[in-house]
């Protein structure tokens, strides 16, 4: 606004026009701008007619209770008005905004991810970068989404230089005719820091870089609608006239808009980056998610108590004991109870002191500085890991305090609104002092979440009214309004609010206890239940309304209201949460995709079926595997409170809240019983339907976060192990003749050899000096070939080894490193060692040079990185890999720090299988902690960082610095002749502030010897030690005292002398010196003095463990990393490499008799493969040399090779279940087979295998989880077998190509379903399920009965086509039409005649004997005579049964007949039609069947009930049964 007004005034002054002459549109615009700046509110009785501007103001007022994480936006708005300052202090987080917006149906615009160059708006607000800080109030862990961005401020695009310096930019050479244009310009880059243009040139590599291309010319004027420009034209008389025209306001594309924000971030060019670099505060303090803030003593005391509770004492839900050992307080573990409390108080005091160092602005010390230089203040009770944990939990405390203050202030405002306003609705539930105290003393984000959820339920609908009321008080224009309705309408349209609006809450208040009273009764019965005299439904009658039309609806609404309020009570939630987490169980079951995907190599193979496993038994990152599998659709995860035993015994969670009579009246009247039942329903609804699902999701997220934290800790531990050891340090004392007069000050020569995985590529060796710079390199084309290989391989190998020997003889490295790529590395290492030994034996080198196998992963990451390509553009990839390997052998820390670059190559390291599934910023945080520790422990040679690019990244991990401050510091050094002579120059020359200097000074070392060679200035010897500048005087005093010279002696000379003979420091009484310092007011400094003494004895002595070559289990893990993991019990595919023989005992060969075969030939008793016609040949074979065709020995097994280069042994007894003499009878060389790993010995690199089918089929039950669900496993196994069988059958059936309306390529089941929808006369012809040369014909007889017969095909042209001849029952047919007409349709017609007969039994089949006989008797009663009944057979389709009474005893006989193509066959006779059969039957029904007459044993003339299977009569044709 001010900018626009000023521009308008300048235009007026320059043009000489009055206000009246202003263009009307511009005057209206200015008037509108001024009207927007006025703070007034026009009261209106009709809110529905408010205009858009009023709604916009109301939205801004919402910021009074909605958190906005964008602190820069708050700062920019804080200067606008008193009102916005008031609301800005009371904001909640984005999650609260989402909740309230959801409740109020407010839509908000999504934040943009790209940097925006916004036009200057009417209100002249600065351009801001969206803040991605996670302020999730509803998460205890605080960072579920995990993509927090760097906190770099963004502001208005500033300029570099004055307006006069920019005047030439606008200069246009006048050609005499063209009009000159003078545009009123306002630079949008005035606020950019000094020197930013130079920085931009460095980043973009452009010498003529012009910042004008980054910003619009009219950046400050884009918000104006009517902008003008002056055009000076010649008036034709030698004069000039000025013409004002409207400027073209078309948006122009700028260079900055075309650049990705990430590219801009890399250059640290933004004003916020410059501010961070220049501010005298550690950069990590400024970039922390919740920045470090000032705190008073009371807050620090509370925070120290909170940290020791939640950081070191509070347990996790899952079992993380093994991983938490590094973070535990060793000083108070396993102490006697009498000592524990005193020690704990001392630890709390130390934690408070650490917090003072961090949060008191006069200190601002990082944890690393505290651990090194403030040991006495923490009484040596806290380790470095403990200090970082305190630092991390300080961030959580600040985050918690920020949220707590916002919630507390919101509740305070609501309470003020309740007390002072006339809103009767707001007064129904007053906020008490206890509610405010609960908020003030909340200790976890979970507690705050519960408080906030309860507040949202009870008071969320009143927030708009509260805002309007506060707005009226601020403006002084609030009009008193008379509330004409008892319940005000709410924006929210949920079920609870509907109940509130219709007064159902009054009925909920008559249940006997409020939700608050119920929660207070959980621990002890504090409140008695007030019993209502009316029955529940009678009481509900009083509240019937249009929305709740009957008493049942009213009562249900009241129950829902009370249940909702109970479920939001913080005490209830806390109680349910504790119960749920203590006893929760989970179930795991693989999905169909999981059953096919999870094999023995999957980490969940032995844990894929889990039943009722307690959540507390989960360990480390186990649950993250389940979560990842669930996200991939491999398993289903179910979490429940009750175990299977609890479910069987009906022991549910809600019973704990129903059984204690918390909400029960102890009376037995009908009224009380009904109310007790209603109360139980409320509690059950609150617990089971509302809280349990919420707690299930919360628990899931909690244990998932714990699993992710476990992965981060394991990554930290693995990373720490890689940088915890120093580089190789040669023994210079015994190396005098080897250096040829070289300066031995750190002069190490390291060589590394790398061979590629592709054997046809060349291998490379490289030599680096003590600075990691390349001295020389070597190319060996045939290094990977074998010395005794076939053809010319041996000669080519010798050529490469000769090159290697000459290189070593010339360069004389102190050590040689070889990459661990696969198992070949062990052979190649032997080749190098033999070459070195050969040189030493010939006296070509003065001592043996050690050869080390080295972890190759970091070197390969560097090889593939953009950084390596930029630094070594002319070197092939393998040479770049060798360079990195040599630097790792020299010192691993600079090389790992080198990977922490703008491309984040450090995350390409494989530290854990699940490292990609956790928050990458969380991973970066823990890795940076370790790197900061080790970098500062080693010290940073700042001149080396300025000189060598691969050392540069170490500087950002120096205590107090960061990437921005390190970049800024290096620029200052480069401007200072690339040399820092002393630590004091960091302040004088590089302008480091006192706080940053205090943090970093002790860890920045100056190589005093090399600096002395480059400058004549005084060099402080202590600058090359860990002694901090604040204690230099004490170090000098110690040197003078140790030499026992006069105090007037030169302390510098004393220091030089004491460093040459440090043994004299042992005579110093440092304890007395410490006492003297304490008396002088310096405090306890004993540890500091001892550290100074140690440092004077050996300046910057490497405190890391010495370099050690990987061996044993570690070497095995590195070798096995190239392929799939091999573990005991696993089934692995391997290739048979050779047969293993046991050598022949030459002495016992004479006593061994050859075997004689049936053919008369003699067989060798050892190898079992050589035969001879005479025993002498066998004897000669056994005594001969195996390399010349002699007996190789007795075969004992086979040697197997796996894809990762590992080899294993499978003995004869494990090849087959039967006896095996010669393995080659069972397996073949170079053929792959599956083997089971029975035993794995990592120390000896041996695998003991078996390929017996019995071993391969069996799973290793010992590896299965304790809670393995065997029942579900077996059920799924049967299901998989069934599916596999169906799939096999489907795949084996040939799809037929037959053009006929009755033919379908379907199965029998599908055909029956189709027939159910078709007419009775239809049939389906389909492929036979058993033979490709056959068809099946199916038709429906009656309900559930289908007839099916086989048709044989012959004379087929193709397997999928129909045969030219079809045969059924001895009859042949030419085509399907003839088959249907002559064979199928006659039988269908007869069967239809039977099923539609008036005496047919339609309600079942003949196998249902009792039902058929009952139907016969019903027909007899109906007809008055003995009837007969037809029924179809289910077991034998196409056969029917006739049931009838054959005498006066009402006994029923059942006889079977069947239909044939030419009629009906009954009692071994054929009948053309059913009528003829029945005519014959009526004449002979009293005669027994032939089978009964032929029986040898007298049998009854009747049979009661149907037989187990219908009697079978041999048909006259075959094939259609």
Swiss-Prot record:
Start-end of Basic and acidic residues biased regions: 77-89, 126-157
Location of the region described as Disordered in the Swiss-Prot/TrEMBL record: 1-238
Gene: emb-5
Role played: Histone H3-H4 chaperone that plays a role in maintenance of chromatin structure during RNA polymerase II transcription elongation. Required for several aspects of morphogenesis of C.elegans, including regulation of division in the germline and gut and specification of ventral-uterine precursor cell fate.
Tissue: Abundant in embryos, and less abundant in larvae.
Entry GO terms, CC: transcription elongation factor complex
Gene3D superfamilies per the UniProt record, alphabetical: Nucleic acid-binding proteins, RuvA domain 2-like, SH2 domain, Spt6, Death-like domain, Spt6, helix-hairpin-helix domain, Tex N-terminal region-like, YqgF/RNase H-like domain
InterPro entries with a match to the protein in the record: HHH_9 (IPR041692), NA-bd_OB-fold (IPR012340), RNaseH-like_sf (IPR012337), RuvA_2-like (IPR010994), S1_domain (IPR003029), SH2 (IPR000980), SH2_dom_sf (IPR036860), Spt6_acidic_N_dom (IPR028083)
Acidic residues: compositionally biased ranges: 45-56, 67-76, 90-99, 166-176, 191-200, 209-238
Known partners and oligomeric status: Interacts with glp-1 and lin-12.
Protein name: Suppressor of Ty 6 homolog
Entries under Pfam families matching the protein: HHH_7, HHH_9, HTH_44, S1, SH2_2, SPT6_acidic, Tex_central_region, YqgF
Keywords from the named record: Nucleus, Transcription
UniProt KW Nucleus keyword: yes
One example of a Gene Ontology biological process annotation: transcription elongation by RNA polymerase II
Subcellular location: Nucleus
Protein family (similarity comment): Belongs to the SPT6 family.
Organism encoding this protein: Caenorhabditis elegans
Classification of source organism: Eukaryota, Metazoa, Ecdysozoa, Nematoda, Chromadorea
Record domain SH2: where: 1300-1389
Motif (Nuclear localization signal): 26-42
Annotated Basic residues bias: 26-41
GO molecular function, one term: histone binding
């Amino acid at each position: 606004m001010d900018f626009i007004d000023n521009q308008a005034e300048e235009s007026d002054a320059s043009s000489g026009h009055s206000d009246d002459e202003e263009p009307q549109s511009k005057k209206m615009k200015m008037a509108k701008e001024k009207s927007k700046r006025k703070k007034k509110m026009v009261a209106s009785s009709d809110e529905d007619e408010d205009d858009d501007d009023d709604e916009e103001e109301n939205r801004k007022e919402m910021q009074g209770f909605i958190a906005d994480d964008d602190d820069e936006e708050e700062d920019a708005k804080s200067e606008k008005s008193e009102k916005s300052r008031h609301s800005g202090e009371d904001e909640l987080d984005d999650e609260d905004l989402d909740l309230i917006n959801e409740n109020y149906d407010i839509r908000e615009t999504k934040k943009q991810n790209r940097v925006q160059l916004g036009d200057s708006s009417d209100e002249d607000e600065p351009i801001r970068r969206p803040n991605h800080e996670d302020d999730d109030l509803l998460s205890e862990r605080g960072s579920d989404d995990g993509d927090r961005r760097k906190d770099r401020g963004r502001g208005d695009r500033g300029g570099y230089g004055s307006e006069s310096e920019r005047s030439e930019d606008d200069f246009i050479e006048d050609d005499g005719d063209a009009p000159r244009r003078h545009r009123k310009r306002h630079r949008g880059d005035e606020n950019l820091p000094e020197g930013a243009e130079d920085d931009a040139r460095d980043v973009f590599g452009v010498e003529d870089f012009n910042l004008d291309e980054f910003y619009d010319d009219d950046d400050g004027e884009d918000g104006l609608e009517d902008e003008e420009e002056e055009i000076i034209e010649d008036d034709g008389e030698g004069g000039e006239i000025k013409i004002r025209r409207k400027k073209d306001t078309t948006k122009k594309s700028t260079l900055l808009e075309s650049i990705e924000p990430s590219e801009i971030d890399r250059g640290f060019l933004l004003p916020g980056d410059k501010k961070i670099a220049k501010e005298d505060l550690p950069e990590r303090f400024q970039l922390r998610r919740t920045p470090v803030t000032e705190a008073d003593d009371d807050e620090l005391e509370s925070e120290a108590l909170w940290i020791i509770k939640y950081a070191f004492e509070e347990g996790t839900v899952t079992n993380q004991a093994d991983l938490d050992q590094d973070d535990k307080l060793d000083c108070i573990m396993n102490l006697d109870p009498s000592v524990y409390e005193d020690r704990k108080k001392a630890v709390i005091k130390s934690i408070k002191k650490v917090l003072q160092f961090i949060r008191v602005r006069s200190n601002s010390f990082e944890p690393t500085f505290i651990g090194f230089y403030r040991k006495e203040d923490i009484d040596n009770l806290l380790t470095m890991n403990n200090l970082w944990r305190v630092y991390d939990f300080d961030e959580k405390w600040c985050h918690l305090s920020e949220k707590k203050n916002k919630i507390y202030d919101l509740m305070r405002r609501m309470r003020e609104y309740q007390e002072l306003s006339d809103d009767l609705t707001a007064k129904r539930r007053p906020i008490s002092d206890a509610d405010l105290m609960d908020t003030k003393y909340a200790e976890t984000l979970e507690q705050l979440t519960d408080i906030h959820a309860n507040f949202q339920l009870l008071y969320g609908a009143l927030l708009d009214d509260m805002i309007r009321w506060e707005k009226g008080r601020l403006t002084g224009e609030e009009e008193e309004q008379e509330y004409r309705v008892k319940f005000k309408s709410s924006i929210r349209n949920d079920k609870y609010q509907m109940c509130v609006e219709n007064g159902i809450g009054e009925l909920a208040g008559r249940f006997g206890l409020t939700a608050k009273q119920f929660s207070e009764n959980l621990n002890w019965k504090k409140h008695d239940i007030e019993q209502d005299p009316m029955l529940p439904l009678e009481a509900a009658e009083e509240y019937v309304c249009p929305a709740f039309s009957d008493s049942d609806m009213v009562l249900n609404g009241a129950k829902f209201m009370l249940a909702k309020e109970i479920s939001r009570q913080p005490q209830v939630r806390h109680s349910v949460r504790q119960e749920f987490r203590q006893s929760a169980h989970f179930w795991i079951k693989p999905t169909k995709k999981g059953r096919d995907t999870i094999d023995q190599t999957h980490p969940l193979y032995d844990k894929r079926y889990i039943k009722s496993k307690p959540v507390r038994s989960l360990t480390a990152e186990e649950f993250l595997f389940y979560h990842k599998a669930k996200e991939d659709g491999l398993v289903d995860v179910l979490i429940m409170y009750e175990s299977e035993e609890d479910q069987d015994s009906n022991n549910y969670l809600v019973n704990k809240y129903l059984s204690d009579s918390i909400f029960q009246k102890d009376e037995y009247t009908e009224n009380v019983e009904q109310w007790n039942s209603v109360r139980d329903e409320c509690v059950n609804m609150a617990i089971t339907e509302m809280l349990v699902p919420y707690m299930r999701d919360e628990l899931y997220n909690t244990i998932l976060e714990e699993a992710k934290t476990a992965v981060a800790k394991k990554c930290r531990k693995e990373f720490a192990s890689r940088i915890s050891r120093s580089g190789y340090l040669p023994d210079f004392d015994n190396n005098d003749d080897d250096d040829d007069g070289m300066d031995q000050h750190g002069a190490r020569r390291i060589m590394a050899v790398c061979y590629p995985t592709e054997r046809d590529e060349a291998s490379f060796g490289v030599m680096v000096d003590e600075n990691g710079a390349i001295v020389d390199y070597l190319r060996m084309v045939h290094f990977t070939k074998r010395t005794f290989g076939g053809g010319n391989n041996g000669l080519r190998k010798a050529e490469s080894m000769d090159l290697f020997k000459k290189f070593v003889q010339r360069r004389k490295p102190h050590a040689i490193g070889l990459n661990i790529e696969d198992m070949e590395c062990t052979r190649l290492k032997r080749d190098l060692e033999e070459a070195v030994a050969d040189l030493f034996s010939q006296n070509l080198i003065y001592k043996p040079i050690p050869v080390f196998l080295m972890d190759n992963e970091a070197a390969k990451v560097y090889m593939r990185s953009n950084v390596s390509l930029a630094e070594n553009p002319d070197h092939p990839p393998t040479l770049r890999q060798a360079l990195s390997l040599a630097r790792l052998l020299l010192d691993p820390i600079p090389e790992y720090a080198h990977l922490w670059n703008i491309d984040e190559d450090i995350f390409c390291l494989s530290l854990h299988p699940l490292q990609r599934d956790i928050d990458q910023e969380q991973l970066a945080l823990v890795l940076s902690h370790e790197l900061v520790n080790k970098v500062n422990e080693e010290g940073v040679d700042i001149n080396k960082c300025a000189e060598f690019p691969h050392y540069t990244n170490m500087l950002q991990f120096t205590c107090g610095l960061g990437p921005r401050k390190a970049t800024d510091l290096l620029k200052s050094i480069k401007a200072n002749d690339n040399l820092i002579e002393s630590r004091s120059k960091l302040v004088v020359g590089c302008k480091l502030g006192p706080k940053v200097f205090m943090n970093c000074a002790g860890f920045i070392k100056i190589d005093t010897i090399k600096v002395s060679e480059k400058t004549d200035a005084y060099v402080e010897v202590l600058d090359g030690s860990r002694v901090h500048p604040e204690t230099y005087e004490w170090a000098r005093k110690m040197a003078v005292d140790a030499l026992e010279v006069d105090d007037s002696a030169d302390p510098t000379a004393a220091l030089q002398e004491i460093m040459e003979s440090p043994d004299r420091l042992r005579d110093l009484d440092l304890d007395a010196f410490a006492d003297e310092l304490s008396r002088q007011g310096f405090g306890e400094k004993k540890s500091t003095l001892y550290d100074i003494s140690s440092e004077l004895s050996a300046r910057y002595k490497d405190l890391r463990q010495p370099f050690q070559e990987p061996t044993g289990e570690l070497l095995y893990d590195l070798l096995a990393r190239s392929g799939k993991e091999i573990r005991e019990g696993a089934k692995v595919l391997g290739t048979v490499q050779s047969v293993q023989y046991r050598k022949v005992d030459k002495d016992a060969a004479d006593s061994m008799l050859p075997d004689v075969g049936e053919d008369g030939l003699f067989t060798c008793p050892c190898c079992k493969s050589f035969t001879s016609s005479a025993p002498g040949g066998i004897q000669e074979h056994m005594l001969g040399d195996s390399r010349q065709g002699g007996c190789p020995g007795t075969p004992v097994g086979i040697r197997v090779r796996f894809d990762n280069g590992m080899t294993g042994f499978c003995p004869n007894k494990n090849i087959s279940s039967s006896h095996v003499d010669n393995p080659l009878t069972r397996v073949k060389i170079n053929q792959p087979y599956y083997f089971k790993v029975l035993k794995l010995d990592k120390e000896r690199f041996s695998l003991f295998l078996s390929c017996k089918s019995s071993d391969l089929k069996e799973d290793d039950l010992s590896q299965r989880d304790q809670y393995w669900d065997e029942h579900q496993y077996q059920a799924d196994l049967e299901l998989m077998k069934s599916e596999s069988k169906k799939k096999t059958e489907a795949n084996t059936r040939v799809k037929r190509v037959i053009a006929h309306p009755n033919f379908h390529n379907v199965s029998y089941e599908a055909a029956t379903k189709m027939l159910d929808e078709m007419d009775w006369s239809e049939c389906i012809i389909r492929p036979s399920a058993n033979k490709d040369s056959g068809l099946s014909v199916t038709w429906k007889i009656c309900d559930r009965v289908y007839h099916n017969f086989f048709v044989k095909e012959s004379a087929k042209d193709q397997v999928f086509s129909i045969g030219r001849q079809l045969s059924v029952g001895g009859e042949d047919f030419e085509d399907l039409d003839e088959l249907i007409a002559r064979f199928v349709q006659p039988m269908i017609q007869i069967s239809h005649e039977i099923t539609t007969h008036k005496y047919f039994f339609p309600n079942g089949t003949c196998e249902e004997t009792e039902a058929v006989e009952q139907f016969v008797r019903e027909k007899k009663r109906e007809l008055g005579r003995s009837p007969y009944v037809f029924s179809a057979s289910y077991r034998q389709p196409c056969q029917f049964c006739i049931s009838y009474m054959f005498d006066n005893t009402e006994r029923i006989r059942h006889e079977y007949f069947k239909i044939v193509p030419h009629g009906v066959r009954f009692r071994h006779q054929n009948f053309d039609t059913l009528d003829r059969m029945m005519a014959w039957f009526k004449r002979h029904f009293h005669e027994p069947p032939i089978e009964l007459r032929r029986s040898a044993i007298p049998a009854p003339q009747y049979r009661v009930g149907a037989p187990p299977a219908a009697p079978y009569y041999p048909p006259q044709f075959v094939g259609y049964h």
